[in-house]
Curated annotation (Swiss-Prot):
InterPro entries: Snake_3FTx, Snake_toxin-like_sf, Snake_toxin_con_site, Toxin_cobra-type. It comes from the Eukaryota. This is Long neurotoxin 1. Keywords: Acetylcholine receptor inhibiting toxin, Disulfide bond, Ion channel impairing toxin, Neurotoxin, Postsynaptic neurotoxin, Secreted, Toxin. Disulfide bonds join C3-C20, C14-C41, C26-C30, C45-C56, C57-C62.
Amino acid sequence: IRCFITPRVSSQACPDGHVCYTKTWCDNFCGINGKRVDLGCAATCPTVKPGVDIKCCSTDNCNPFPTRKRP
């Protein structure tokens, strides 16, 4: 499987059986910059803390950098 990986947001090969993930959360600058984003791959879908959103998927390049809605 190929997943997008931060910080360069480049597509990279991940080991067999891994899943891609997109993790987003707010920090002190969320109102200005939008949510922080972490893209990667892991053996299983990571467990996250409250306030952190995660989406996992298992097809090539299924975790592109999310687009920010403009007001």
